[in-house]
Amino acid sequence: MLEKTIYYKMITLKVKNIIKEKLPLKSGDKIIVGVSGGADSIALLHILTELNLDLQLIAIYIDHGLRPDEIPQEISFVKGQAGAVGAEFESISVDVLALKNCDKLSTEDAARRLRYQAFAEARERYGAKYIMVAHNADDQVEEFFIRLLRGSGRRGLSGMPYQNGLLLRPLLSLTKADLLLYLQERGIDHCEDSSNREPCYLRNRIRLDLLPRLEEYNPSLRRTILNTSSILESEEDFLEKSARELFNRSTRINREGKLPKTELDCRSFSGGHQALQRRVIELICWQMDAQPSFTHIENICRLATEGTSAKTLQLGSGLRVKKEISQVVFHYPLGRIATRQGEREIRLERRIDGEGIFAIPELNRQLTISTGEGAGEGRLLVDREKINFPLLLRFHRAGEKFHPLGAPGRKKVSRFLTDKKVHGEDKQLYPVLINGDGNIIAIVGLAIAAQFKKTETSKQLISIGWQETTT
């Protein structure tokens, strides 16, 4: 092995300082290290070892199934490098093309998803504390342009952080040239990934075509971009903290049910700057497992700040945003399901053979059929002798009518629901319960049909309950 040079010492010292200042590593920590065999990851593996931090390293190689002619040699090489530094080694195969075709993703996106999923599973399997990858300053510049072309805002253009949860990136301050020189001085070999030269990948086109062209206008472009990302990162931190403060002042999260409900106070929210308002709405949606588009965020902001009321917006996965006087409520009235046009249609046809408690996951509700008067809000009582099992719980049909108890005659179910201030897709929350003879017994949770009412001569009653699922 060659004599340690001054440049080698500079590189290792730089990484050591980054770890000390920005990363939470401690002696004895077990770390998953992503090692592809390329210069960056091989340098990372050796630098971590030579820093003598007493880390337990597990080198993980991901076979994406895209370069079958090169993979065996790479696996053998990485295994040898891991053994040379005393690290454990595992090769994991993933099927990128299957995910790409199934979810209509680009090859790059599918590979990234599967790669990080494999790292996360390996971390659990080995009981490791963190995952470490070899992203460097050149990757940071390329990522800036990838995100810029995709329309990212300040947060995205701030670049990749040194730490993102359990993911650590200790090489972000080093360039590709730094790492290649490190390997050269240490006499360490590395693999060349042939796919890095293929123009079909966006990152490659940026690295091989766009950046060289832009550097004709600004030879210091890469340093300029890194400086810009650093400025944006600092400003992003300030904005994020300010948005959190507005979020804490203006929202209340109710976790009593199976799915969370968030209430946004319009007055407190309206006092915030528009930039912070957008972030608060995005934060609410993410916390409720929804991915809002720019249009969603803008519409919700208008709903909260303008003087409109009783308006409802639909987001994907069943999330509903409703204006209620002085607040906006985010909730899942039908459960976490697709409700928008073009997504999976909700269907409901449930046979009820007798008494019991019946989960209706389609609506995040449960139906209870029991003998006696029962107890609980929203229970309806009907004459047992008039009930013919099996019953059927389903959505009402267009034009379907029944005779509500207390009404002078028959009425369309849809019109009855409208009269009860139940509108739009909220009507699905109140399906009809059909008797064995085909007649409507009740709109569950709201009303029974007059012909099934209890009378003085009723010998036994059936109680019909309809509650939101809370367990």
Swiss-Prot record:
Pfam families, per database record: ATP_bind_3, TilS, TilS_C
Compartment(s) of residence: Cytoplasm
Keywords in alphabetical order: ATP-binding, Cytoplasm, Ligase, Nucleotide-binding, tRNA processing
SMART domains, per the entry: TilS_C (SM00977)
Principal location listed in the UniProt entry: cytoplasm
Highest taxon of the lineage: Bacteria
Keyword match Cytoplasm: yes
Sequence similarity: Belongs to the tRNA(Ile)-lysidine synthase family.
Protein name (record): tRNA(Ile)-lysidine synthase
Species in which this protein is naturally found: Desulfotalea psychrophila (strain LSv54 / DSM 12343)
